[in-house]
Amino acid sequence: PAHRPQTYWQAIQLYWFTHLAVTTELNPWDAFSPGRLDQHLYPYYRKDVEAGILDDRKALELLECLWVKFYNQPAPVKVGITLKESATYTDFANINTGGVTPDGRNGVNEVSYLILDCMDDMRLVQPNSNVTISKKTPARFLKRACEISREGWGQPAFYNTEAQIMELVNAGKMLADARRGGSSGCVETGAWGSEAYILTGYLNIPKIFQLTLFNGYDQYSGKQIGLKLGEAKDFKTFDELWAAFKKQMEYFVDVKIRGNNVIEKLYAENMPAPCLSVVTNDCISNAKDYNAGGARYNTSYIQGVGIGTVTDCVAAVKYNVFDKKNFTMEELIEAMEHNFEGYDAVYHMVHDKSPKYGNDDDYADEIMQDIFELYRSTITGRPNMRGGEYRIDMLPTTCHVYFGDVILATANGRKAHKPVSEGISPEKSADTHGPTAVIKSCSKMDHLATGGTLLNQKFTPDVVAGETGLNNMASLIRSYFAMDGHHIQFNVVDRQTLIDAQKHPEDHKDLIVRVAGYSDFFRNLDKPLQDEIIERTEQSFS
């Protein structure tokens, strides 16, 4: 700016003015992140401390004032499904703490620890606070973040610095820009200050496989919405079924991208963002608006939803119908049409006796890899309207509840209208071999080919209690990140507390849970979303 901040306080104030400007311009909804807030503030912090005009108490107080500002930021008006499921989440401002510096050194500093203390003191659902953990991150910093997480209010989330950087580099970003980047919104990765990345909406992958089994006919709406590629009972081999699934995937991705491109063109022509363009690299030199392709990088993301559910569905069909011939496709379809009522034998086979993603089972996990690659290859590299390209990420926000509501019974034994799996997490109750098996299954996905993946884990408080529990939690994070996992977050709360909070919300007004890439008060969630959180598997290290 023309008048640069001279003090720590002024630097915080400048950020808040900038944040207000861009969010107000966009009414106020786009998940803007302040970037590496700890690294941006650190030079001012050191200067003021050395000058004797700032101590840690005052520095923390100013951060907490900023947190209050974030919390009071008016959220966009919710409508439709979003209003019903989670009407109170705010504007997804995401504070990244830790990571590395633009030249690759450890980025943790004194302000990083002050931000952790601020999170712990304030315990607000907004801003969305996370820590980025690199191989160079001190153990003390990770353990302090784990201490806060195990207190049971859903923050901070944990991100893999090296994975974030490689995701951006693999997408064509310069290394220095990638190191300055990180995660905003839910879990998506961007090159802050240089990239206009837009989340274009969600793709219901289990629904596409369901339509494949029913020859493009949608049981929910009673309409033919997919391609007619043949009745499932007529497929003689699994390869024939897979070929039909591939064609349906390509068809629905084409429909989605055509719609997205119309919207992007409308934004470019009718929705200029002058303030955002001023603070985004290359918009001025390119003489183009942020929404018209002026930024250095211009990415459009499509979010895949339900990878756990669809993996188990495909695995159940392949294992039981084609490999073991436990029953015919016709028998499975008939059981699904009746919501498995009166078809206990088929239900037991698909729900309890078939390979499941999330257990380090190569049979299921290789199917997950195939589905992921089909999804990735169908989307990644497609041109958008801003001179950039489409890429993928794997996150649901809350739409996994709605996506499940529009699907009747599925081939994995999931009953009609139940939520599908969220993020890259396994289907509820399918992961029976503990958290280590979960992260090993999840790590078989190519995270570095995405713009972000979301993994939820749930522990009861006793599992992460004491020094042993704390060390186990930190080790789980380090192990997952060593296998290129992008993100992991925790709900530390027991099932009975959640059930009681559902029945007696007046007694649990301050209960905060991690939903997807954000936290919210449990009492403010719609009942189906509350049920989904209650039903998540409670993990144990034993």
Features from the language model and the residues they span:
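Conserved catalytic cores of very large enzyme subunits
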Residues: 1-308, 313-542
